[in-house]
Amino acid sequence: MGLLDPSQKEVLKFAVSCRILTLVLQALFNIIIPDHHADAFSPPRLAPSGSVDQLVEALLGGLSRWDAEHFLFIAEHGYLYEHNFAFFPGFPLALLMGTELLRPLQGLLSERSCLLVSVALLNSLFSVLAAVALHDLGCLVLHCPRQAFCAALLFCLSPANVFLAAGYSEALFAFLTFSAMGQLERGRGWASGLLFALAAGVRSNGLVSVGFLLHSQCRGFCSSLVVLDPLKGLVKLMASLCLSVLTVSLPFALFQYYAYTQFCFPGSAHAIPEPLLRLASDRGYRLAGDYEPPWCSRAPPLIYSYIQDVYWNVGLLRYYELRQVPNFLLATPVTVLVVWATWTYVTAHPWLCLTLGLQRTKDRESLEKPHPGFLSAKVFVYLVHAAALLAFGGLCMHVQVLTRLLGSSTPITYWFPAYLLQDREPLLRCVDTAPQKLLENSPPGQKAPRNCVMKLLYNWKTCSPVTKCILVYFLTYWLLGLIMHCNFLPWT
């Protein structure tokens, strides 16, 4: 789709506006609300800060809370501590590239200030590009421009908004993942595999995305059985499946090998500044060269699974404690959304789901009448991906992470609400396909918006209960996340 497409221009404009508003509000909340004293990773600042650095910290310091501090530390100092290896290198490398572009300002700003500016600029860029990529993907998969347009606008108001703005890897991951999905829908398998591999170097759940490549190849194999020799086709399929798995898992394997060389080889210690050594001693952080950690003798020697187990207590049902009830409540809306989406799709297409999306229906007639929108047959693999992430995250992870995990990994969390809005909201149900037709019912004396989300907000009183629930969820988490996360309050 061209950049001059009206709906794409509207998505771009709305995404940029939301990014600007996000940065302004986080600065405001960071200034007027005192920070909570959280027991979080807080390394000492090695370089003195000037007045400009203090200004940058006041305006953008809200982007450096919680896990963002790990990414900033890795970008500045590298992987010094063992627990730093819980955070993949893709985003820190992007930050380093951003600071290189800011090199002319390094006489004025400290390295940390340059990193904060890089976070603000790069994550704003990645979030905008992710919104455009999601719109493009929606048009390819849903075959319903209205739902694709609405879903992209909802992404701009994502409940995971603060994590798309702060020094987290979600924005870059969403951009790479949605772009990879779009390339695969266009039949560009190599480009898709490369983008999925890059995404796997940004976040660990990128490894799950190999399922899209595997499903696409299996679907191609099934459709070619009538014209190809089955044995020859099966050999070709197995080779392509293995290549896809190797391609997507390569960044993860290289990262694990790098950790192994740092902690499991004698004499791998590096010179470390005294304040960082003192921090390691005070907090019990393990450094390379201290002594060989237990994971070095495991088979395979994976530092990532060890860190998740020992440092973060990640494991099956480990988070199911009474004191974690508030975090389960935080994750309830996105859980309900994905479960509802799964139920809606499975009940609409039971045969499609039983055949794993490889054969759409028993009835040849209905094959010729594909469902547009969320109920499209192409949505099946995306729904399985979302359900798998929800199941694993809900059973094995810190459940409050589900909002940002699903919000940055799967389009289902935006396609399904868009489907509900189009299906249940009278204000949108009767509107034509083109977004520029969304012009009626706006307040007197005001120009009616093309933006369907803004249209619903302008006509809030007449919206259906389902619409109000969706908008309240998106807007509340969008704003509350900024208020709490930027001040070290528990929103992680």
Curated annotation (Swiss-Prot):
PTM field: Not N-glycosylated.
GO molecular function terms noted in the UniProt entry: alpha-1,6-mannosyltransferase activity; glycolipid mannosyltransferase activity; mannosyltransferase activity
Topological domains annotated Lumenal: 35-77, 135-136, 183-192, 256-327, 400-468
Keywords: Endoplasmic reticulum, Glycosyltransferase, GPI-anchor biosynthesis, Membrane, Transferase, Transmembrane, Transmembrane helix
Keyword set includes Lipid metabolism: no
Name of one Pfam family that matches: Mannosyl_trans2
InterPro entries assigned to the protein according to its UniProt record, in alphabetical order: PIG-V/Gpi18 (IPR007315)
Stretches in topological domain Cytoplasmic: 1-13, 99-113, 158-161, 214-234, 349-378, 490-492
Transmembrane stretches, start-end: 14-34, 78-98, 114-134, 137-157, 162-182, 193-213, 235-255, 328-348, 379-399, 469-489
Name of the top EC class for this enzyme: transferase
Membrane topology, from the record: Multi-pass membrane protein
Domain of life: Eukaryota
Gene Ontology biological-process annotations: GPI anchor biosynthetic process
Compartments, as annotated in UniProt: Endoplasmic reticulum membrane
This enzyme's EC code(s): 2.4.1.-
Pathway stated in the Swiss-Prot or TrEMBL entry: Glycolipid biosynthesis; glycosylphosphatidylinositol-anchor biosynthesis
Cellular component per GO, a single term: endoplasmic reticulum membrane
Function: Alpha-1,6-mannosyltransferase that catalyzes the transfer of the second mannose, via an alpha-1,6 bond, from a dolichol-phosphate-mannose (Dol-P-Man) to the alpha-D-Man-(1->4)-alpha-D-GlcN-(1->6)-(1-radyl,2-acyl-sn-glycero-3-phospho)-2-acyl-inositol (also termed H2) intermediate to generate an alpha-D-Man-(1->6)-alpha-D-Man-(1->4)-alpha-D-GlcN-(1->6)-(1-radyl,2-acyl-sn-glycero-3-phospho)-2-acyl-inositol (also termed H3) and participates in the seventh step of the glycosylphosphatidylinositol-anchor biosynthesis.
Family membership: Belongs to the PIGV family.
Protein name: GPI alpha-1,6-mannosyltransferase 2
